């Protein structure tokens, strides 16, 4: 009975919000009015249902037009004024799809991290909303990171759509300094590390809202895998190919630590492999090859360093022996010399 009452109240609030939006935007731009109405209809309080795809498509249709800022503002407004976990989760899904559909124009969620400010979000009205609240806190940080990927890379090419993009991306990355490639890769690995922190709570409800979040994250994951893979391939060539500008000692150390962090993500990310198994296998095979190569290079440096230390110690010992073998001579002066 309490569940039915909550459902009825939710329906009433949804209709009231839509009626208010019609009134508020009745004298404004028709496009802005449609954006707000489509957004409200896609982020209803109906539990266990993801945002209505038709209404989401209507919002996204403005993402590459001059009304893109209005679409983002409407979604962010909807997110920030609600205390309902179902509405907040659906709003985040809409924001995610807006980011994905307008990567070339999207300026990010702000000038820093944690712009969505959802770290304290909590809806304790039911077990379902408690479960969704954990996802909301994680998902907000995830979208903050996703919005910064184009800033880190300069763009967000989709290497799956056009094979030529992969060649162009590799040519572009090959022109970068090694340190810059490592910094880019470091940011992308941080993205993987955040995916590893996703909620692992047992699903109390077979919730299609959470299923859609997982689906969107998996799509992003494999796009990022392709971007990381291009950078690892360029770094691998610089490690093993003669005539190619080598990775310096400092860069090698940073790269080794980065690979260790990447390997530590593998187990947690393994649950996402099923979508593109071959790509995942190729990616982790490359990571293992690079890790082995960097370890070999580091071991070689350690051997050379040990040899240098041994030579230095031997030289010092010979110098001590030489000094010890020199007999002091006493010099006497005649008084007539003064």
Curated annotation (Swiss-Prot):
Protein name in the entry: Putative clathrin assembly protein At5g10410
UniProt keywords, alphabetically: Coated pit, Cytoplasmic vesicle, Endocytosis, Golgi apparatus, Membrane
GO cellular-component term (any): Golgi apparatus
InterPro entries: ANTH_dom, ANTH_N_plant, AP180-like, ENTH, ENTH_VHS
UniProt-listed PANTHER family: CLATHRIN ASSEMBLY PROTEIN, ENTH DOMAIN-CONTAINING PROTEIN
Domain ENTH: 27-157
Gene Ontology MF terms in the entry: phospholipid binding
Oxidoreductase keyword on record: no
Pfam families according to UniProt: ANTH
SUPFAM superfamilies (UniProt xref): ENTH/VHS domain
Entry's Gene Ontology BP terms: clathrin coat assembly; clathrin-dependent endocytosis
Subcellular location as annotated: Membrane, Clathrin-coated pit; Golgi apparatus; Cytoplasmic vesicle, Clathrin-coated vesicle
Gene3D superfamilies: 1.25.40.90
Domain of life: Eukaryota
């Amino acid at each position: 009975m309490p569940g039915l009452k909550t459902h009825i109240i939710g329906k009433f609030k949804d209709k009231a919000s839509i009626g208010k939006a019609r009134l508020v935007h009745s004298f404004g731009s028709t496009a802005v009015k449609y954006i707000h109405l489509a957004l409200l209809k896609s982020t209803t309080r109906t539990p266990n249902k993801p945002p209505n795809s038709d209404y989401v498509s209507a919002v996204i249709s403005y993402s590459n037009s001059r009304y893109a800022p209005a679409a983002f503002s409407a979604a962010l407004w909807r997110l920030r004024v609600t205390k309902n976990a179902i509405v907040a989760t659906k709003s985040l899904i809409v924001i995610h799809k807006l980011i994905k559909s307008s990567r070339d124009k999207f300026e990010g969620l702000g000038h820093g991290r944690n712009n969505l400010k959802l770290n304290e979000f909590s809806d304790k009205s039911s077990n379902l909303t408690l479960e969704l609240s954990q996802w909301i806190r994680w998902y907000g940080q995830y979208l903050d990171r996703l919005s910064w990927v184009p800033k880190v890379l300069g763009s967000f090419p989709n290497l799956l759509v056009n094979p030529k993009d992969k060649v162009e991306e590799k040519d572009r990355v090959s022109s970068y300094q090694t340190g810059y490639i490592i910094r880019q890769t470091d940011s992308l690995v941080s993205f993987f590390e955040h995916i590893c922190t996703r909620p692992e709570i047992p699903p109390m409800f077979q919730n299609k809202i959470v299923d859609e979040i997982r689906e969107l994250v998996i799509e992003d994951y494999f796009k990022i895998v392709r971007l990381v893979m291009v950078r690892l391939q360029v770094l691998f060539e610089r490690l093993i190919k003669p005539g190619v500008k080598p990775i310096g000692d400092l860069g090698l150390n940073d790269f080794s630590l980065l690979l260790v962090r990447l390997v530590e993500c593998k187990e947690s990310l393994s649950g996402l492999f099923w979508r593109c198994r071959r790509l995942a296998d190729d990616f982790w095979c490359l990571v293992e090859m690079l890790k082995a190569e960097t370890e070999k290079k580091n071991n070689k440096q350690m051997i050379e360093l040990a040899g240098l230390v041994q030579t230095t110690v031997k030289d010092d010992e010979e110098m001590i022996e030489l000094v010890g073998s020199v007999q002091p001579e006493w010099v006497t002066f005649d008084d007539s010399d003064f």
